[in-house]
Regions:
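Residue-level signal for inorganic ion chemistry
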Residues: 36, 92, 173, 215
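Conserved SAM/SAH cofactor-binding pocket of Class I
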Residues: 62-146
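Short alpha-helical
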Residues: 108-109, 136, 150-154, 177-178
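A short SAM/SAH-binding and catalytic strip from SAM-dependent methyltransferases
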Residues: 142-155, 173-175
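Active-site capping/gating segments
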Residues: 174-218
Length: 218
């Protein structure tokens, strides 16, 4: 990572939460940036590089960490669906010390990338990669996250199946996405009852509103 991008990353982390601006967190996210940059040309992980990768992806994934953190604690089980490039799963894992995190990714090459990157970031102890489609996942989780994944109408029953009672789903959304349609899917679901709310959050140095769609399993 070039010096100017490192300084940008450090500034962004401090703006989100000064307590996260530690050598360990910064080093992990810097390594994630380097791994994505190295493998992106071959794997097509994310359509961004340089400053855009730092702000629109890494910092965007980190920005709502306090919203997620307030719903769990050390030892909480979190599943990140469609992890692909590690966004947001590996970004969150860098900050959520002591959480038990599973990165769910069905594609072999991307699952391999995730395994290598978990090891490179020094997080093998509490982060594992599950190379399966969501429909095949059998474990249960306290918290589920995803970003740029499938629509709720395609996954709502699986979310219900693997989320414990009292658990929460955090779906990263841009302001342009049709959140109302997603909420209608949730309200019409005939399985368990989900409560929902939409939380806005800001990303440092990004002049665009971002939103988090939160589901609570009653």
């Amino acid at each position: 990572m070039e010096k100017n991008l490192f300084e940008l990353l450090e500034k962004g982390i401090a703006s989100i939460d000064s307590t996260l601006c530690t050598d360990k967190v910064i080093s992990r996210l810097r390594r994630l940036y380097d791994e994505i940059t190295l493998f992106n040309p071959s794997y097509g992980l994310v359509n961004a590089e340089g400053r855009d990768l730092v702000i629109r992806h890494i910092l965007d994934c980190l920005a709502p960490v306090s919203i997620i953190c307030s719903s769990g604690k050390e030892g909480s089980r979190l599943a990140d669906l469609g992890s692909g490039s590690g966004l947001p799963g590996l970004v969150l894992a860098s900050a959520l010390e002591g959480w038990d995190i599973s990165l769910v990714e069905r594609m072999g090459r991307r699952a391999g990338f995730l395994r290598n990157t978990v090891a490179a970031m020094g997080m093998s102890q509490n982060v594992k990669v599950i190379q399966k489609d969501l429909s095949e996942v059998q474990e249960s989780y306290d918290i589920i996250t995803f970003r740029a994944f499938r629509q709720f109408k395609d996954i709502i029953s699986d979310l219900d199946r693997i989320l414990v009672p009292g658990g929460k789903v955090f779906a990263y959304k841009s302001s342009e996405e049709n959140i109302q349609e997603e909420l209608e899917t949730v309200s019409s679901y005939s399985g368990c009852r989900f409560s929902s709310e939409v939380r806005d959050y800001d990303v440092p140095m990004l002049d665009a509103k971002r939103r988090m769609l939160v589901l609570f399993k009653d």
